[in-house]
Amino acid sequence: MKARVLIVDDSALARRNLRQILESANCEVDEAEDGLAALERYFLERPDVVLLDLVMRGMYGLDVLEKLRQLDPLAKVVVVSADVQTSSQQLVDQAGAKAFITKPFDREEIIGTLKAVLGGTS
């Protein structure tokens, strides 16, 4: 799978784990550790998909998602979060996320979800 992916998570460990999974699938990876950096990186790099954590310092992930979708209605965002509350998942769906992956995740779940979101792009 060849895709450009922006990882947005304030946890360096989570970013590293996602990067390893994505690079093993031949993805180009960029990272941001907070919401403001994510918005900047998105418009500089124009990734195919964004993997976005919800609970971050500074700017909550849902706010990042809403801002991205306002500025680019075609933005493909997959939320990756330990927040398993149904209400959070519903808010994310309403805000326009393409998918919701619950932490902890595994390689197959990440790659399978990205393929589905990107329309099977290989």
Pin down the residues of each PLM region.
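Short hydrophobic/Thr-rich beta-strand motif most characteristic of the beta2 strand and flanking loop
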Residues: 26-33, 41
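The feature encodes the CheY-like receiver
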Residues: 57-58, 85
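Acidic catalytic/metal-coordinating carboxylates
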Residues: 34-37, 60-63
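Alpha4 helix (beta4-alpha4-beta5 surface) of REC/receiver domains from two-component response regulators
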Residues: 63, 84-101, 108, 112
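Active-site beta3 strand of CheY-like receiver
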Residues: 45-51
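Residue-level signal for the "D+5" position in two-component response regulator receiver
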Residues: 31, 58-59, 94
